Amino acid sequence: MLIDHKLSNLSKIVNCDLIGNDAFFEKVSTDTRSMAEGDIFLALKGPNHNGHDFINKALDKGASCLITEKEIPGETYIKTENTFLFLEELAKFQRLNFKQDVIAITGSNGKTSTKEILYQLTKNFFENKEVFKSPGNWNNKLGLYLSLLELNKNHKLAIFEIGTNAVGEIKELASFLKPNIGVLTNIGNSHLEGLKDTQGVLEEKTDLFSFVSLKGTCLMRAKEKHLQKAEEKIKKRKKIFLQVKETQSFDQNLEMAEAVISCLPKLKKNNFLLSEEYINFLKKKAVVPGRQELLIGKNNVNLIDDTYNANPESFRAAFKKIKSMSCKNKICVMGKMNELGEKTLLLQDEVIEDALSVFDLVLAIDLDSNIKDENFKIIDSKAIYKNLEIYLNEESVILFKASRSVKMEKIVKLFK
C-alpha cells in the first residue's frame, strides 16, 4: 500500500478505532486460502460466503488484525459498520495518493491479453517491479478495489482492466479509477443480456472516455460507424483510433499496446524494435490459461483450450487462429454463449455457420440450433470422448470453447 504498513495508519484512513495493539502488517487479504502470516483479514460479505465465518481460520493462519462488523474479544481488530465500504475507502485513498500514470483497458474481447502484452513491453523501460498490472481478470468493482490495494510506493505505472455486463458499470469503475489513458480494444456482441445490442455495448464501453483526465489520451479500435459516439465522450482529449483489421487477435493487441506506449510521456521518446524472437516471447506471455491456450494432448493431438469465456467475436478470433494452422483434421467443440439475450439462437447459429467454413467437424454440447449439416452434431457432454477418439493424433487440432458457466475445462482434461 501507499502508507507505512502499521495498523494505526490503516484505521486513521477510514476513521475507525483499532482495538488491541498496534503492529505492522504485510497486506490486506479477503481470502484465507491465500493469505499469509502477518496479513490483515478483511471479512467481506458476499452472495455466497460471509467472511466472518472464516475469522477463526484467519487467526489460525496468523492474521495480524481483523477488519469486521462485530466485536472479537481478545483479538486485535478494527470494527466497521460495513466491511465492503471500508474496502472502498481504502481503495479511494490508494487512488488519490497514486500520482503516476494509470491505464484502464476495456472492450468486448482482448482486455486481458492487451494488458499482459502492455505489461511485458513497459517493464523494459522501468526497474524491477515498478510496473503494476491488476491480477488475472479482476475487472469488476471488487476486483478493482482489491487491485488498488496492491499499489505501493515503488510503482511508476499501473495498468488496470475493467469490465461490465450491465448498464452503468463502466461509468462507476472509470469514475473511481480516473485513468489518464483509456483503452477500448473493440466493440462486439458481448453481455447483450444486460446491454441489449451492439449499440448498447458501444454506449457502455465508451463511458470510459468520459472519465479519462482532460489532458489524457483515449485509444479505440472500432468501425467507422462507432466513432461518432466515442467522439461525443472524448471531447477535447487526445485520441488515437485504430482500424479494425482481419488479422489475428494477438497482432491487434500488440498494435494497441504499442500505441499506448506512444502516449506515455516517460516512454514515448524511447524507440524500440521488436525482434521476431521477442514477439514469440510476447505471444507466450499473452496467453492466459483457458484463452486460446495451445496444449499437446493424448497421442500428440493439438488442443486449443479457449474455455475461459465466449461471445461471437471471440469465437471468430479463435477460428482465424485455427484456419492458419496446417493440421489435417480440424474439430470445434463448442458450448453455449451466455448473456446474448433474445438474440442467442440467431447469433449462435451464425457462429456455427462460420465454424463450418473452417472446421471438418463441429460438435455442439447441449445447444439448440436450426443448422442442418452433415459436419455438425449436437451431442451430450458424456458422448464427447467417443466422438473424438478417432481424431486423437498429431494431425488433428481440436478447439474447445464456451462461456465460463459451461465449465468446459473439465472436458479438456479428458484429452490431456
What does each model-identified segment do?
Residues 1-89, 93, 323-328, 340, ...:
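N-terminal leader/targeting and accessory segments in enzymes
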Residues 55, 170, 205, 209, ...:
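Generic hydrophobic/aromatic pocket-lining and core-packing "Φ" positions
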Residues 105, 289-291, 405, 409-411:
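ATP-dependent carboxylate/acyl-activation modules
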Residues 87, 118, 122, 147-148, ...:
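Buried hydrophobic packing segments
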Residues 48, 288, 299, 307-375, ...:
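Active-site beta-alpha connecting loops in nucleotide-dependent enzymes
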